[in-house]
Amino acid sequence: MAKFIHCADLHLDSPFKSKSYLSPNIFEDVQKSAYESFKNIVDLALKQEVDFIIIAGDLFDSENRTLRAEVFLNEQFERLRKEQIFVYICHGNHDPLTSKITSQWPNNVSVFSNQVETYQAITKSGETIYIHGFSYQNDASYENKIR
């Protein structure tokens, strides 16, 4: 049986403008929370020896990504790669696919295009499974992708 983690809406680099009323120490902790959450997800994936992680939209808070976020993700994806854990990313309405995206992820990471795609995965137990998905091209999409 496939063993995986499904997550979404991590919103790395969110400015948390609505939380600016918090004390500086607490506000700093809130700003770190998305990074800590994703690190905890990776830690759990490694501990549970999952086959893959699906990130179903809004990994980033906007289409503009900071170097900090890219370096952090590369480090986390590399930890997963070393244990042969794959990552499938769908971009959401907050972080749509754009020509600005130049990230080069490790070879265990696949990013869905704006068309429905299917990836074939072989689990650690030898089972073949298919993962279907797509990424948002724009911050709003009303197109029915499943027909």
Walk through the language-model features, giving the residues of each:
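N-terminal active-site segment of His-dependent metallophosphoesterases
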Residues: M1-E70
